[in-house]
């Protein structure tokens, strides 16, 4: 007996997608927190922010999760995490093995569970969206949201005006280029210069990225490798304890600043 599917009308597929997606865009036109970048620090921050009851939107320019996790170390499918971040791995249900002084996790499981736990906590993640600018106010000076564009439009070079999303806080978790802070520093008198990261010194990088995670200006925060770009810190390679701890720390700082 042939398998029978529900009748499918092609136009109804379009309606279902456009109507439900549009409803969510309207809902998230205003959020408590916008996290830019779905890498390790961004996903960690999103999970803990959402758990605190903050309306949290994650925007990722690519069509995947995990930032630099997926490539492991030079395409070997493993990443290293320091024992100091063990509690976060356990909190996300990420399995690991012990290897000398480190914990070693599977890169695919690592990024999948970071994303799943962030979503389960209530964060909304939308792929294929780039942040090309910020919304600001000057009394007092601060960031109040972002200007967004489809990544495909950005890549194509077409001239298409962006749309705007307001938020009480924006977290730059875009990685090595600190893209949100970079554009804000160029266009707003933030007295911040993004000089970029230094060459590798893993121990110092991991420690100082966590120490310097936090607020750049009212409404704008740095997490993960964006911190290295802003503060000219060393890079660290495929070791992710600092990224996890930075994501958790920025969530705590944002929640405190928003009085939650």
Swiss-Prot record:
Question: What keywords is this UniProt entry annotated with?
Answer: Iron, Metal-binding, NAD, Thiamine biosynthesis, Transferase
Which Enzyme Commission number(s) are listed?
2.4.2.59
Q: Which reaction equation describes what this protein catalyses?
A: hydrogen sulfide + glycine + NAD(+) = ADP-5-ethyl-4-methylthiazole-2-carboxylate + nicotinamide + 3 H2O + H(+)
Q: Name one GO biological process term.
A: thiamine biosynthetic process
Can the keyword Chloroplast be found in this entry's annotation? no
What InterPro entries does the database record attribute to this sequence? FAD/NAD-bd_sf, Thi4_fam, Thi4_prok
Q: Name one Pfam family in it.
A: Thi4
Question: Which positions bind glycine?
Answer: 235
Q: What class of enzyme is it?
A: transferase
**What residues bind Fe cation, as annotated?**
161, 176
The cross-references to HAMAP family, in alphabetical order and at most eight, read: Thi4 (MF_00304)
Name used for this protein in its record: Thiamine thiazole synthase
Species for this entry = Archaeoglobus fulgidus (strain ATCC 49558 / DSM 4304 / JCM 9628 / NBRC 100126 / VC-16)
User: Encoded by which gene?
Assistant: thi4
